[in-house]
Amino acid sequence: MLVRRLFQPSTLHWAWRTTALNHPLGRHQGGLRWTHSGGRSYRAVIFDTGGVLVPSPGTVAVGWEVQNHVPSGTIVKAFIRGGDSGPWIRFIKGEITTEHFLEEFGRLCSEIAKTSVPVSSYFSLLTSEQVTKQFPVMTQAISQIRAKGLQTAVLTNNFHLSSGESFLPLDRKQFDVVVESCLEGICKPDPRIFQLCLQRLSLQPSEAIFLDDLGSNLKVAASLGIHTIKVDRPETAVKELEALLGFPLHLGVPNTRPVRKTMAIPQDALEKYLKGLLGTHSTGPMELLQFDHGQSNPTYYIRLADRQLVLRKKPSGTLLPSAHAIEREFRIMKALANAGVPVPTVLDLCEDSSIIGTPFYLMEYCPGIIYKDPSLPGLEPSRREAIYTAMNQVLCRIHSVDLQATSLDSFGKQGDYIPRQVQTWTKQYRAAETSSIPAMERLIQWLPLHLPRQQRTTLVHGDFRLDNLIFHPEKAEVLAVLDWELSTLGDPFADVAYSCLAYYLPSSFPILRGFRDQDVTKLGIPTVEEYFRMYCLNMGIPPIDNWNFYMAFSFFRVAAILQGVYKRSLTGQASSATAQQSGKLTESMAELAWDFATKEGFRVFKEMPATKTLSRSYHAWAGPRSPRTPKGVRGHSTVAAASPSHEAKGGLVISPEGLSPAVRKLYEQLVQFIEQKVYPLEPELQRHQASADRWSPSPLIEDLKEKAKAEGLWNLFLPLETDPEKKYGAGLTNVEYAHLCEVMGMSLYASEIFNCSAPDTGNMEILVRYGTEEQKARWLVPLLEGRIRSCFAMTEPQVASSDASNIEASIKEEDGCYVINGHKWWTSGILDPRCKLCVFMGKTDPQAPRHQQQSMLLVPMDSPGITVIRPLSVFGLEDPPGGHGEVRFKDVRVPKENILLGPGRGFEIAQGRLGPGRIHHCMRLIGYSERALALMKTRVMSRTAFGKPLVEQGTILADIARSRVEIEQARLLVLKAAHLMDVAGNKTAALDIAMIKMVVPSMAYHVIDRAIQAFGAAGLSSDYPLAQFFGWARALRFADGPDEVHQLTVAKMELKNQSRMQEPAVPRV
């Protein structure tokens, strides 16, 4: 078994030993012999395992590498590396333990990939139940071979598990002989292991057939005289094996199996009923089989005399309301018989439960092909394209049925299909609920609030998928559409979205297989965009732009269905053997639905350009809100006369009232979210930060993040100039986001809730600006989606890091990768358990010009050699869960492709990173200051000292006045800098960026200090946010460079600027 078959003969150079086995080949001791029509007789079939009976480990590795961002081919290269002395060969020979193998193999993979490779994850997948299921076609073939009296054997390269047992994911009762490499100490393609297998079968080589998927193994077997079959596809190999043996190896009806005991039905009563219905007087036995697909209604194949039928029944036991409506199936297929939609011929509906225990209906058996794997393995790309085109066309025919002509106009309610469906599936889910699933709870609230405004009404299938279609064996023609139990009158786009489930599911997903991890272009399958355009073109209708809603709804339905299947499996009612797996899948389907919900953009803002249909976005605009003036929003007497558009950035917007209507609504929504959802939870969030669990993410924060996503308040920070296509963010200008950033500064927790917190924002921006497509896929996307966090390693304890050219950390090229050594501190975010990426700055060439010595690397946090020495606190504040760490990097190896922009570009990247970041820091500080002043005003109006209210004390009034003036001055300076960045670029705005960093932290420090003074000792407590505001305001006088550096920059630029008015020269006397 396993990986020998992945290699070509030239890859490994074997030194074959010439010593013979201690025991000579035994001669056959009788037994059955099957003679092929060509005269050759066979007495046994020997099977390899991986790639023959179960999926190949190479195939498993390909998908796993894509999903885990491991360079393609790493696993296979590691299998080959070292030949006989490599860890893999020693492992399959049983010479080393699983733990020893994983340690050596992991180190080898990391060397090959130039990054850390989680081989334990691959090994778990390789040995998991989901990828070790025996191919049904092979199971049937083995059964038929043994029924004819031939022997069967398995000859496998396998290994020991940690438990000490050998890994063989098969029913050993299927085989007369099992030969395992890890038990024998030899492995394929060593000829001795073939000879050993033949000896235990008591056969000559010419009496056996051997199936393997690797030519090197087959070549050795053939040289011994064994007949061989190369396995590329199990189905094709079985046909070749049939031709050699001369008898059929599959059951007469594809996709059927003997009836499971829990699904047995009374055959005598059924046969009597059928003979009465069909007028059949045959005395032969009735043949009854069960179809191996169908999760909802049990489906059976019946052969009686010369009639082939299909029986479909309701499940036994108590059922959910309105579920398993086989009566509707019967009615719709009968009505469609002459309506241009291919359906099986229905014969009778029996509602008498006394016959087989439940109502059922009968239809003619329609021979053909059901493609259960949507990737259509083994077919040519052109054939795959034709099949999906035919699928699309038949869906259009369903949606084009004349409802009146077919008397189906009363088949369901007209209009409001989606609201009714959401309500129905919510009820179905509640009735089958076994435990609370957070994503389902969020969807149940979200879906009714985001319904499509306009819906067409047609006949809808309700469960339209590739595996519910029967195709012609020779051409891409749909012969019949099956499984109509969910059909009704409704929104046709729900059918279209449901038919695209496979595009978003991985190939390893049980029950509903997909091809998300495969290149559909290479397969020949239309992309989801092409499939949707094809549908709209065939129907003659314009495309819709709320595709994400329909996908969210589709996966919500799937989750509800799977929950029902799981509930029935607990009582033995479910019809499929895989039903019990559905309990684990409901949650993942709900999470996938929620992922679409958070990406759904409803085009609320008419001024914003519409996004392209079906294009993926990591920001979702929320639904419209009625305009209002939110409580606590500052007002200014000076209001911009007009709202500048993104295309014409003319005027400086100095207050929220001057924002465009679209952004103004977003601003108001943000204020409302913080006031209603964040402020009330601040005490509890503060308690979490002080608890023993503080280094774990707060569940409240995680819940608020999901709510923020759902309302479109997510990834607002990326400026339009960086992301002009709005692929990753909201497409706001620096000025627009500055106003929103101030609102986020009102709460210490807001930035993380909206995925707008440092250092992630800076790291995401440099990935957008400078990252390769591979770097974006691996790091940017999960950061944007909030699945991981990151840190930034630049500051060092041994040098004055205010001068970036001082850094001593080294980045050296060695053996095709970069090796990092250095000591960093104040590395913000590194303590967060979700931190998976470190953006590291070090020197690649100390001899280069001063600002070309540094480079930036993307360092996976699981790379060997990274040690967090200790957490650092700010005025005693630990800032969990991200914190700030002192870190040592020792011989950390990073692939060369992880460098950003190129060697010597680190200082350039750092400067590009700081511009927008300084706007964000400064506007959040203004938010701190605004809230501190508001708290101060409330406090002094409610407290009395020395016989009169504090508000009447002269010093208090003076402090309030100074604070207001300083806040206004600082805000105008920041907005001016943001405006210059928008209209002239960061370089032109350099002076203003330096000025705001010099002015704003100092301003905030003084304003917050005055508020604390007005509060007295209470201002120092954790009962109010003032102490934390003060601590971070003081710390930000260092972040992005200390005040003195910015003062120096401003002074130098001022002296260089000759355009300022100058005093006339003093005349000499």
UniProtKB/Swiss-Prot annotation:
CDD domains listed in its UniProt record: ACAD10_11_N-like (cd05154), HAD_sEH-N_like (cd02603)
Location of N6-succinyllysine modifications: K413, K427, K1052
Top-level taxon: Eukaryota
UniProt record, GO biological process: carboxylic acid catabolic process
Record SUPFAM superfamilies: Acyl-CoA dehydrogenase C-terminal domain-like (SSF47203), Acyl-CoA dehydrogenase NM domain-like (SSF56645), HAD-like (SSF56784), Protein kinase-like (PK-like) (SSF56112)
A single cellular component GO annotation: mitochondrion
Any GO molecular function: oxidoreductase activity, acting on the CH-CH group of donors
Name the record gives this protein: Acyl-CoA dehydrogenase family member 10
Organism the protein comes from: Mus musculus (Mouse)
